[in-house]
């Protein structure tokens, strides 16, 4: 399948801890969820690699996301890896499961045609004991509180939040949700930084 152009921007930190940020289609890494998560990771000393699409509507996203994870592990096999993905970026879930990679999956596609393999991958990650965070909002048609909670993953279920994890017409609730997500990502990263590798 043809893929569109992209590049990976890297902010160097500890070479033994690498976080990979996978944006959505219309939600770039400059969006608040990924931007603040990136700041939290950098503040904690992680090397952060951010995938940036060079087109508005990327083709072949699934393959690009998968290759980005595999390439990072191949290039840095001794490093701890963590993925933070938003929406379309959660198409990388099956490869994360294959690699045993911990992750924070923001607004994962738990409903719709893309959902079945992603739900399976989440269950595989949880069954394997790989730390997995799912964050979504009850106002998002692509999110399923039921499937998220049944998976056994850590779940941040935000009442009334849409696919951007914002609560329409309620800026205070939206800011609170942003803080919850950023804290959850920071906590997950902190755990991975101190967990003994197998």
Segments the model singles out, each with a brief description of its role:
Residues 82-94:
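Gly/Ala-rich beta-loop-alpha elbow adjacent to hydrolase catalytic centers
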């Amino acid at each position: 399948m043809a893929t569109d152009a992209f590049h990976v921007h890297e902010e160097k930190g500890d070479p033994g801890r690498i976080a990979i940020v996978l944006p959505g289609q219309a939600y770039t890494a400059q969006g608040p969820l990924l931007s603040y998560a990136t700041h939290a990771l950098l503040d904690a000393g992680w090397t952060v690699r951010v995938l940036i699409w060079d087109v508005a509507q990327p083709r072949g996203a699934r393959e690009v996301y998968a290759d980005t994870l595999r390439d990072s592990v191949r290039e840095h096999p001794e490093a701890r890896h963590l993925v933070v993905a938003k929406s379309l970026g959660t198409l990388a879930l099956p490869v994360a499961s294959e690699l045993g990679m911990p992750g924070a999956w923001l607004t994962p596609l738990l409903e719709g045609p893309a959902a079945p393999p992603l739900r399976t991958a989440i269950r595989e990650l949880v069954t394997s004991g790989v730390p997995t965070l799912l964050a979504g909002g009850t106002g998002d048609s692509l999110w399923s509180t039921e499937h998220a909670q049944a998976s056994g993953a850590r779940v941040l279920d935000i009442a009334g939040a849409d696919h951007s994890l914002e609560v329409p017409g309620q800026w205070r609730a939206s800011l609170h949700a942003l803080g919850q997500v950023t804290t959850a990502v920071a906590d997950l990263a902190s755990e991975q930084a101190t967990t003994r590798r197998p």
